Design a protein with these regions (language model features):
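Extracytoplasmic metal-acquisition and chelation regions
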Residues: 2-9, 15-361
Length: 361
């Protein structure tokens, strides 16, 4: 009887051990299968090309030029909407979960980018296209000359409605004299809100840096197509270098270096080619100039003999037309590349060069 009980116990133990071994084997097999499935999924993803999402039309154009047939590139911003003020929808967020790369401009353009970083899948990568670019301060008032004395005209108490000393080169304002928190110095006007100018793409040199950042990210995410990405980048750089040379040659002959523009989007272009932008509106083109600012722009144009005012596609040109009528200037259209176009980045910049060349000769 005792022997029978022992035999039953041994059999039960053997059965339990066998079940446990089978469960462990199944678990190991499942783990291996999941790993293989994940690897296969990744391989298939690369074979089908990278899934790339961008925040602007410019980053889309650069990414598409580098990816070629090795990737699908989608811009979040819908047709007919500009880069300023865009916010991604829940549908956009779902699309980002499936993206291999999300490429954004940076420089403060996309205030919502941190939310996207939390949304991306674990295999996705977020790329700041403007990384490594020296950013310009934004929010400068129109009468500031880039690299020159901030104020060229005299301020006095007779022609300004200020309660403080009207010397424009001596902004010694205390808190007691103002009811706002803006800091003032000899380089910045009271309309400077301390941000950075996000329009980095308006410099062809910056576009090359952006393209390099994008290519590096593609190679990291898809090393199997490294040769393709590098070859496409080299071809793109040739075109960008040629474009840069065209700008230098044409604008070196400009008789005037001042450009009155709809909003403060041309600082990087101006810096590269020795121009000075006089913006009617600020960085995001959402505010209109007050009567005093309008008067200053008109006076500056008359003093310097500026013959053109540059408007923008998709934007109301009423204020620019008013300034033009007051000064006898002509109106031409310059594109800050903030809305979608049938043309790519290089073609749009070539069009801008033709406009500038004809106006500044």
């Amino acid at each position: 009887m005792k022997f029978r009980k022992i035999a039953i116990a041994v059999c039960a133990l053997a059965l339990l051990t066998a079940c446990g071994s089978k469960q462990n084997a199944n678990a190991d097999a499942n783990s291996t299968n999941n790993k293989v499935e994940a690897e296969d999924k990744t391989e298939n993803k690369k074979e089908n090309g990278l899934n790339i999402v961008t925040s602007t039309y410019i980053t889309r154009d650069l990414a598409q030029a580098i990816a070629g047939d090795s990737g699908k590139v989608t811009c979040l911003i819908p047709k007919g909407q500009g880069v300023h003020g865009f916010e991604p929808s829940p549908k956009d967020m779902n699309m980002l979960k499936e993206a291999d790369l999300f490429i954004y401009n940076g420089a403060g353009l996309e205030s919502w980018v941190d939310t996207v970083k939390d949304t991306m899948g674990e295999d996705g990568e977020v790329v700041e296209a403007s990384k490594g670019i020296e950013l310009l301060a934004g929010g400068h008032h129109h009468h500031h000359d880039d690299g020159e004395e901030a104020h060229e005209h005299d301020h006095d108490a007779d022609n300004h409605d200020h309660d403080h000393d009207a010397n424009a080169n001596d902004h010694n304002h205390d808190a007691a004299e103002h009811d706002h928190d803006h800091d003032h110095d000899a380089e910045e006007h009271d309309h400077d809100h301390g941000g950075k100018d996000p329009h980095v793409w308006m410099s062809v040199k910056n576009a090359k840096q952006m393209a390099q950042n994008i290519a590096d990210a593609m190679i990291k995410q898809d090393p199997g197509n490294k040769a393709t990405y590098e070859a496409n980048l080299a071809e793109l750089n040739k075109k960008l270098d040629a474009l840069d040379t065209s700008f230098k040659d044409a604008l070196a002959k400009a008789k005037t270096k001042d450009i009155v523009v709809s909003h403060e989007a041309y600082g990087y272009l101006a810096k590269d080619y020795g121009l000075h932008q006089i913006p009617i509106e600020g960085i995001n083109s959402e505010s209109e100039p007050d009567p005093k600012a309008m008067k200053e722009i008109i006076e500056t144009m008359k003093q310097k003999g500026i013959k053109f005012v540059f408007t923008e596609p998709h934007e109301d040109d009423k204020i620019a037309q008013t300034i033009a009528s007051e000064t006898g200037a002509q109106v031409k259209e310059l594109d800050p590349l903030e809305y979608e176009s049938d043309k790519n980045y290089i073609e749009r910049m070539e069009s801008n060069l033709k406009v500038l060349e004809s106006a500044l000769q």
